[in-house]
UniProtKB/Swiss-Prot annotation:
The protein's name in its UniProt record: 2-isopropylmalate synthase
Record flagged with keyword Secreted: yes
Molecular function GO labels: 2-isopropylmalate synthase activity
Domain of life: Eukaryota
Family of this protein: Belongs to the alpha-IPM synthase/homocitrate synthase family. LeuA type 1 subfamily.
Pathway named in the protein's UniProt entry: Amino-acid biosynthesis; L-leucine biosynthesis; L-leucine from 3-methyl-2-oxobutanoate: step 1/4
Organism in which the protein naturally occurs: Cycas revoluta
Coiled-coil positions: none
Subcellular location, principal: secreted
Amino acid sequence: FAQLLNDLK
C-alpha cells in the first residue's frame, strides 16, 4: 500500500 502514500507525495 506504499504506492498510495507515494502518490500523495
